[in-house]
């Protein structure tokens, strides 16, 4: 029988067992990296960008209140939220965002904040200019000018006829050219056998007789009364009982062919 070999456990002197200190160091380094990255991220963003991020994250249809937005920033960016002048910068960012058109406050400055809907720029359609119609127009104008030139050559000289005096006389005596004074003086002999008439009766007669020839009816009374006043001043009409009395025709001064 061969003797049993004695087995002895040998331990490696050079290698040391791993301790928990190395793990703690690695985790602390990772945490420091995360915090520094978050600090850099928060410092690189403006308050306006943080508010926009909060509005998109909260997704409230009617907008988010200021306290809700402040809470979001303080929870996600505690370094920014812990600043002493946080409220001042926060409110200024909202005010400038509203002025710039980035935010909306439908219920006023104390109301909720919403992201403004950006209007899509309207693209102006350029009018298509077709050169063909212009050429056609120029050709038509050229033919028209040629036709005019031909007509001017062939057309005989026009004989200017003198106007007949009867036409001018008719135009002068037409009722459309009568003044209020002339209408009143023509109406006076027809009323009460020329013995005089009241202002109301005379006015009615003038309206009925010259109704189609009166250009203005809105200021008829004013023009009628001013015409009577001028006739009285000129001596063509007489008012024996004063301005409110009857009106008579001064036959000595006025000679009318009825």
From Swiss-Prot:
It is found in: Nucleus; Chromosome. One of its GO terms (cellular component) is nucleosome. Residues 1-44, 101-171 are annotated as: Disordered. Keywords: Chromosome, DNA-binding, Nucleus, Phosphoprotein, Repeat. Residues 155-164 have a biased composition (Basic residues). GO terms for molecular function: chromatin DNA binding; DNA binding; double-stranded DNA binding; molecular adaptor activity; nucleic acid binding; nucleosomal DNA binding; phosphate ion binding; structural constituent of chromatin. One of its GO terms (biological process) is sporulation. It holds the Pfam family Linker_histone. It comes from the Eukaryota. Residues 1-11, 132-154 have a biased composition (Low complexity). Its main location: nucleus. InterPro entries: H1/H5, Histone_H1/H5_H15, WH-like_DNA-bd_sf, WH_DNA-bd_sf. The modification Phosphoserine is found at residue 174. Residues 43-117, 176-251 form the H15 domain. Coiled coil: none annotated. SMART domains: H15. Residues 119-131 have a biased composition (Basic and acidic residues). Present with 6560 molecules/cell in log phase SD medium. Could act as an H1-type linker histone. Has been shown to bind DNA. Belongs to the histone H1/H5 family. This is Histone H1. The gene is HHO1.
